[in-house]
Amino acid sequence: MPEKKPSKPQVAENPIADVFENRHPSAAEKKWAEKTLAPTLEKAPERPIGAPTGVNLDERDNARFTTISGVPIRRLYTQADLPEDWTEEKYLGYPGAPPFTRGIHATGYRGKLYTMRQFSGFASPEETNQRYKYLLEHGGGGISVAFDLPTLMGYDSDHAASEGEVGKCGVAIDSLEDMEILFGGIDLEKTTVSMTINSPASVLWAMYLVVAEKQGADWNKISGTIQNDILKEYIAQKEYIYPPAPSMRLVIDTFEFGSKFTPRFNTISISGYHIREAGSTALQELAFTLYDGIEYVEWARRRGLDVDDFGPRLSFFFNAHNDFFEEIAKYRAARKIWGQVMQERFGAKNQRTWLMRFHTQTAGVSLPAQQPMNNIARVALQALAAVLGGTQSLHCDSYDEALALPTEEAARIALRTQQIIAYESGVTQTVDPLGGSYFLEASTLQMEKGAFDYFSKLDAMGGMVKGIERGYPQKEIAEASYQFQRAAESKEKVIVGVNEFVIEEESPHILYIDESVARQQTAKLKTLRARRSNDEVRRTLDALKKAAAQEPKAGTNGNISPANTMPYIVDAVRAYATVGEICEALREVYGTYTEVSIT
């Protein structure tokens, strides 16, 4: 049977019908559509969507131009695609002022460039310390700590569950001693540090605070961020330890403690990054992330905390994926929505509470192992979208993201990508340079509406914790992930080097972490436990368990709650209790969480 050739594109009966669909074009646009567009489409129909070769158009008659998330894109955007009451003052505004669509700072990057914060951590604290110093010497503006899986799960390196994972996907941190090594020779009053840690966040943060204290740093002056976003663990990343309610209690403990003792430190980075990496659409990333933020504020207010006390230290973390304009629209909508929610839903009076400050990381999930050097171009475009969207800090993934932890060369190229955008592209010289684009403004409003639709659904469920227990966000993400995979396998979405333009290639040089790191960490733990006062460790852990078992209530007379766990964790850290020992003490009180089956 002869091979069926792809058919020619078919011209619709009315090729300009979409010009009038759900919109009111101007007389000039109607004239253009009839006199210029229609004849053009008759002579040269628009190209097929998806793969350039081997796809039968008869089988793809439902294909449309869409974003990577599947949102339809019009041929041309004009004033007709904006609300009839659209004005610059009402919908767009000015940078540094409500509704914050154009940014939270009046001067944008003319005042201060985004912080170039490369996510890094591998093997031992000693090796990672050297990598941090290398990055700082080559222009990095801050440190972002990647921990290994045992640390993320609250296990010491010598625990049976840690076998084969020590130092593999981040740095192994077991005790205060390791944290002292990690930041040795780095001035913590002058360096902002972000730590990607969630279930054991309060433990690792306590270790950081004690290291700063030992350096002679003033807690009032140190700045940085702990991720501390447990909700997205239940939704997407799955690195949880305790059930949702006690986990939320630990998060609110850090809010209260931070407001009192570390006013410049962000006690949470509410994270959409992992939600997107799990397969969500851009809209789902936006909506679920912001609603996670709403949930944290609700829980903090129920504790009796004032939103204007902790609100200014809430920060966010977003993904930068491949669809350039969709990503920029997402960031702009996020700022606008958050400012509105904080004012109208929570009655925040402090303008700093209205501001959404966010970090961005390029999309690791978009960087395939095939033809990895292509990822340099992908990362550059993603990073550019983040900058045009007004990010406060940025991490560029390395081109070898899918293969291993980055080599020194790969990490340097990633940092240089940020620097080229900042210093050579010209995009940082004016504020919100794409503002006013009909396409971008329409996309921003579409994101905003979609997010509030999700908010209504989650409100009806009783909040995000209730939604998680029902499996709602998990199901939404699973369906979106399936649809994207289907589109990739059918070549409806082209992935260069993966489903099109494929070549045979050799494997590149990658970084390898051997098992000596685990042996080294185990030996250090043995020595530590022999040297420290184990009676003091037991005393501090018993005190922590007693506090954790109490119901926390709002503090009085400017003090924090007597049951706040943070002071007890700090005491245990000072006694050189390990990450695993502190987390085990909390496991004894709270138990562990098993996810319900999602069907």
Task: Cite the ranges covered by each PLM segment.
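Acidic/polar, glycine-rich intrinsically disordered N-terminal extensions of enzymes
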Residues: 1-177, 183-189, 212-215, 453-456, ...
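Gly/Pro-rich turn-and-neighbor structural signature
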Residues: 21-25, 31-73, 79, 84-87, ...
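Hydrophobic faces of well-ordered beta-strands that scaffold small-molecule active sites
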Residues: 114-120, 143-145, 191-197, 222-228, ...
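Active-site cavity-forming subdomains of large catalytic enzyme subunits
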Residues: 140, 162-302, 327-341, 372-380
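Short beta-alpha connecting loops at secondary-structure transitions
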Residues: 164-168, 232-242, 275-280, 318-323, ...
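Phosphate/diphosphate-binding loops
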Residues: 174, 192, 197-200, 214, ...
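Short glycine/threonine-rich loop-to-helix capping motif typified by GTGT followed
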Residues: 204-206, 279-287, 321-333, 362-376, ...
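Flexible glycine/proline-rich, aromatic-decorated loop/lid segments
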Residues: 306-310, 348-362, 370-399, 406-431, ...
